[in-house]
């Protein structure tokens, strides 16, 4: 989204935003069942926002930052909430008649790509994962002054692990 938190599912579904992000319809046209939820802090899950217009004074960013900070200060993290929501969505998706539970995959770009990495390492139902624009180590980001996506701020993770270890923890059929 290029920090465009006012977009979420609508961009992936091809309704607004960059056509390069509209992979949902392409997958659906090719026979995939596609579920595109708004992640917390994006589009319809933003605080004090409705629709796809950005909030003034960069409030979409500040709301996202606050959401991360409040969770870290209370001993939690934003990625945990995103993963809980995503795993619940996968449970609901897998209950739909015609959905092959053995062939559930996940695809994401940027923050979605980070979510793919964590989700595919933790949820055994995922048989395919494709993370785009996200496989950059914490060490590389810090050494080169590259931003760290807010949901990837997981207290104490960097002391023990690196982002790329998430792919090693998976039993995936395919990783792109």
Where do the model's predicted regions map?
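Cap/lid segment of the alpha/beta-hydrolase catalytic domain
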Residues: 1-84, 141-144
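Alpha-helical segments flanking ligand/cofactor-binding loops in enzyme cores
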Residues: 25, 117-118, 168
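Conserved dinucleotide-binding and phosphotransfer motif residues
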Residues: 30, 96, 123
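A structural signal for short, well-ordered beta-strand segments and their strand-loop junctions
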Residues: 35-38, 130-131, 176
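Mobile cap/lid helix-loop segments that gate and shape the active-site cleft of serine hydrolases
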Residues: 65-73, 88, 127-173
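Alpha/beta-hydrolase fold nucleophile elbow
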Residues: 98-110
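Glycine-rich nucleophile elbow surrounding the catalytic serine of serine-hydrolase chemistry
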Residues: 108-120
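Conserved hydrolase catalytic core segment
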Residues: 121-127
């Amino acid at each position: 989204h290029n920090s465009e938190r006012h977009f979420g599912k609508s961009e992936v579904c091809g309704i607004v935003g960059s056509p390069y992000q509209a992979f949902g319809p392409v997958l659906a046209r090719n026979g995939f069942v596609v579920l595109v939820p708004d992640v917390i802090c994006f589009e319809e899950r933003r605080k004090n926002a409705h629709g796809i217009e950005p909030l003034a004074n960069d409030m979409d960013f500040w709301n996202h930052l606050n959401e991360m900070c409040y969770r870290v200060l209370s001993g939690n993290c934003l990625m945990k909430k995103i993963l809980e929501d995503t795993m619940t969505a996968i449970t609901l998706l897998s209950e739909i008649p015609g959905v092959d539970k053995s062939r559930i995959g996940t695809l994401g770009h940027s923050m979605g790509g980070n979510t793919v990495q964590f989700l595919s390492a933790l949820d055994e139902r995922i048989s395919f994962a494709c993370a785009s624009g996200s496989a950059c180590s914490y060490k590389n980001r810090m050494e080169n002054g590259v931003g760290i996506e807010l949901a990837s701020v997981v207290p104490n993770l960097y002391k023990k692990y690196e982002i790329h270890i998430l792919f090693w923890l998976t039993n995936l059929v395919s990783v792109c």
